[in-house]
Regions:
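A short alpha->beta transition loop at the rim of the catalytic pocket in nucleotide-sugar-dependent
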Residues: 137
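Structural beta-alpha unit
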Residues: 13, 27, 76-110, 147-148
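Short glycine-/small-residue-rich Rossmann-like dinucleotide-binding loops
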Residues: 9, 75, 115
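Glycine-rich, Arg-bearing micro-motifs that act as flexible, cationic patches
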Residues: 109-134, 145-148
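Small/aliphatic-rich secondary-structure junction motif
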Residues: 2-54, 103
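A short acidic, glycine-rich active-site loop
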Residues: 53-70
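General small-molecule cofactor/ligand-binding pocket signal
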Residues: 33-35, 88-92, 141
Length: 148
């Protein structure tokens, strides 16, 4: 996949990353792929099956639907920033870091946000952004969260 890949999780940090990635995609005339990962914890799935009240397929379907609606909402909320950019959406059943690394294969750039901490904690990246920095198959930009 060529173009720019950006991770979206609904956080302020990922929305800031989306704004940066959209601007970069427009400037470089590249397509932009928004990736939202969802993951059904196996313990929760097992508990549901053990209690007999939850069908794992139903849980997976609901999580996928929620992730898709969340990604659609982010696109709507950022319609101005995304104007003039070819946008694709990808909803992936996986943990965030592996989903982003897979999506970035063949991409020109991977863009991720990071959590917002000040002081000493601010020197540390979140686990997803840190994993991506070390394993991305393409150049990566880690966008800091909004200040204030």
């Amino acid at each position: 996949m060529s173009g720019i890949v950006v991770g979206i999780d609904g956080s302020a940090g990922s929305e800031r990353a989306l704004e940066w990635a959209a601007s970069e995609a427009r400037t470089r005339k590249l397509p932009l792929t928004l990736v939202s990962a969802w993951h059904a914890p196996s313990a929760a799935m097992a508990a549901g099956m053990a209690w007999g009240g939850v069908n794992p397929g139903d849980v997976s379907g609901e999580l996928r639907t929620y992730a898709t609606k969340r990604l659609d909402a982010v696109c709507s909320e950022h319609a101005d920033e995304l104007a003039g950019v070819e946008v694709m959406q990808s909803v992936v059943q996986d943990s965030a870091a592996p989903a982003l690394i897979d999506a970035a294969e063949g991409a020109d750039l991977l863009v991720v946000g990071t959590r917002g901490h000040g002081g000493f904690a601010g020197l540390l990246l979140g686990s997803v952004s840190q994993h991506c920095v070390h394993h991305s198959p393409c150049p990566i930009v880690v966008v800091p969260p909004p200040t204030g």
